[in-house]
Amino acid sequence: MTKLWIALPFVLLCAFAGLAQSETTVLDQSGQSVAISLPVETIVSVHGIGTYYVYALGAGNRLTIAYYVGLKAVSKASAAMLRWEPRLPEILSFGDPNIEELVASGAQLVLADGSQHEAVAEQLRELGIPVVLYHAETPDELKEAVTLTASFLGPDAETKADAFIADYDRMVDAVSDDLASLRPDDRARVLFIGTSSTRVISNEMYQTDLIEAAGGSSVSSELFGSWNEVNLEQILLWDPEIIVIAPYGPIQPADILENPDWQSLDAVQSGRVYRMPRLIAPIDTPVPESLLGIAWMAKVFYPELVTLDLAQEVVCFYADYYQFTLTDEELAQMTRP
């Protein structure tokens, strides 16, 4: 009996040792090495893009405070988004990150924007809170960001990350195969505009990569930086065949199609002015949903050549990565030109 009581503490010690936290070190997209205690059970995301990486990898329930790209009030959220994330009224945040609020949240880990939040990251690290910084503005950087996120979320997340990357590559390859016989000069010339009719993308923006993956050519590819303001004269010189409007902001196709100053454009004369659909995240940004942006644009650009089933791609994406079943109306919204 004495031997049993002597042995018992060692048995318990070994049992609790198995429950102890481990640690991993990751290299974030700013080049910083970040030590993270595992398992990560509570996450704050002040990066509206990075938030969606967490959801797509099956860990959205670990978010305690979250930014959502383009969303600054619950009242602006779609019915679909509120149905997808019922906790949105409790966890939504926006604006400049509040250090005191982030510390008080008790989060194990903060996800932040590498182009905006370096000072915030430094302050939090000094307080002992690890921060992962993201910078994803190309397809390769998006896939890298998803893989990075999975590396601290666990094996199930890593499996989902591999599946997502395979799906993204499959989408790009399928469109490329369908358009293999298309000559470079026959590629659709596309103007992509943002929150005003003269606010256009540059060559350094993710939207340019999406257009190219969908088989098009951006007429504003000579520009650099972020969004550029141009004049109507420049747009008339470009004379795009297709105009795509970002899925946010006030601009609608009718604003261009019915504007007398735009009537000489090829895109207007043929009626090929479209606004991208949006259900949850804007699909022109480097979020996982952007693979649907490729599919949607490819079908809009080349409806007779691209053979992928857009409806099936939409249904499968939301089911597989967001665990979300679309209504018939939502599916129609995401598949109409």
Residue positions per predicted region:
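Alpha-helical, coiled-coil/dimerization segments enriched in small aliphatic residues
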Residues: 201-227
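Sec/Tat signal peptide C-region and signal peptidase I cleavage site
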Residues: 16-22
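Solvent-exposed loop/turn segments at secondary-structure junctions
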Residues: 49-52, 69-72, 109-110, 115-118, ...
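Bacterial N-terminal signal peptides
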Residues: 7-16
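Proline-aspartate-enriched helix->loop->beta-strand connector
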Residues: 89-94, 98-115, 129, 231-248
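Positively charged n-region of N-terminal signal peptides that target proteins for export
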Residues: 1-6
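A short, structured surface patch at a secondary-structure boundary
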Residues: 45-101, 109-114, 219
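Extracytoplasmic substrate-binding proteins
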Residues: 26, 33, 119-199, 220, ...
